């Protein structure tokens, strides 16, 4: 079974060109299935049945795995069996008809508008690291980039004159995003300093040795900016969530927000309508004269 898994991972890496992060997620999920098969003495992928997966999902759920994680595990199994069927190694999919237990959907954490402005409007020193970090923060918030999209960004994807950035998102889909004036200013201040570092390639964001910044380095810089400016931990996806929520709050155009985020399914984007409702509810509670009725003291 391990041999088939290794061949599948190589297929994902070479033919599907999945990122290392996505490959790691597939590997974690399918390693759980393989461990279960070894424990239950299931000899091969042909022998794995729906009842086995139901047992594994129930077991993982009891151990505290979230519904989202279990849904991803089932998706990983379906992907594996599509490959096995294409290769003539199997003729069934044990995940057919199975779904993860429904759980309470967690709303993403984000910054409100005032906190976002506080983060971005702090003074910026005129040095390599400060200018680079400011440009990253502004671009995350201006254009709603994923971490992988920012890390992989090259100069030929930027058109600052037109105020556009072209990013390669999930599924190798290219989308064109606007770059706001503040982000353009931050990038224009950063790019001359980038050139002085002798960049090794066309990466927009590099370290002082000229090499492209990795995902962990970007996460660290964003976290440090959050602690310094806001006194809280901050991660890149919070800026993407903030971009989406603030844009939806102002425009009420869910379909456009979906396109900007690169979501294949509008259901994924609809989570931000719940966040917008939370904001409206807070405004209502604070401002409406009959939102909070005083307890009647008459007897």
From Swiss-Prot:
Pfam families for this protein: Phage_int_SAM_1 (PF02899), Phage_integrase (PF00589)
Primary location: cytoplasm
Source organism superkingdom: Bacteria
GO biological processes: cell division; chromosome segregation; DNA transposition
PROSITE patterns given in the database record: CB (PS51900), TYR_RECOMBINASE (PS51898)
Record GO cellular component, one term: cytoplasm
Catalytic residues (positions): 146, 170, 237, 240, 263, 272
Stored InterPro entries: CB, DNA_brk_join_enz, Integrase-like_cat_sf, Integrase_catalytic, Integrase_recombinase_N, Integrase_SAM-like_N, Recomb_XerC, Tyrosine_recombinase_XerC/XerD
NCBIfam families to which the protein is assigned, alphabetical: recomb_XerC
Subunit text: Forms a cyclic heterotetrameric complex composed of two molecules of XerC and two molecules of XerD.
Protein family per UniProt: Belongs to the 'phage' integrase family. XerC subfamily.
Role played: Site-specific tyrosine recombinase, which acts by catalyzing the cutting and rejoining of the recombining DNA molecules. The XerC-XerD complex is essential to convert dimers of the bacterial chromosome into monomers to permit their segregation at cell division. It also contributes to the segregational stability of plasmids.
The protein's name in its UniProt record: Tyrosine recombinase XerC
Native source species: Stutzerimonas stutzeri (strain A1501)
């Amino acid at each position: 079974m391990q041999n088939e898994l290794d061949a599948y991972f190589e297929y994902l890496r070479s033919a599907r060109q999945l990122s290392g992060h996505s490959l790691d997620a597939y590997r974690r999920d399918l390693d759980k299935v393989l461990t279960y098969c070894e424990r239950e003495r299931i000899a091969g992928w042909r022998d794995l049945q729906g009842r086995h997966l139901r047992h594994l999902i129930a077991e993982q759920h009891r151990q505290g795995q979230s519904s989202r994680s279990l849904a991803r595990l089932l998706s990983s199994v379906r992907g594996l069996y599509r490959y096995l069927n294409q290769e003539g190694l199997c003729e069934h999919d044990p995940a057919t008809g199975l779904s993860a237990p429904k759980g309470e959907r967690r709303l993403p954490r984000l910054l409100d508008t005032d906190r976002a402005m506080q983060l971005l409007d702090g003074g910026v020193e005129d040095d390599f690291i400060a200018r680079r970090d400011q440009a990253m923060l502004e671009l995350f918030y201006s254009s709603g980039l994923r971490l992988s999209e920012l890390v992989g960004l090259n100069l030929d994807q930027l058109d600052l004159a037109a105020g556009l950035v072209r990013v390669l998102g999930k599924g190798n889909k290219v989308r064109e995003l606007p770059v706001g004036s503040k982000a353009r200013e931050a990038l224009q201040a950063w790019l001359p300093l980038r050139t002085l570092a002798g960049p090794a390639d066309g990466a927009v964001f590099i370290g002082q040795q000229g090499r492209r910044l990795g995902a962990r380095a970007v996460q660290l810089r964003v976290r440090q900016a959050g602690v310094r400016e806001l006194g809280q931990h901050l991660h890149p996806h919070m800026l993407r969530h903030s971009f989406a929520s603030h844009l939806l709050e102002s425009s009420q155009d869910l379909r456009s927000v979906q396109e900007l985020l690169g979501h294949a399914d509008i259901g994924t984007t609809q989570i931000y309508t719940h966040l917008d409702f939370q904001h409206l509810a807070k405004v209502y509670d604070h401002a409406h004269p009959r939102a909070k009725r005083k307890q009647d003291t008459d007897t």
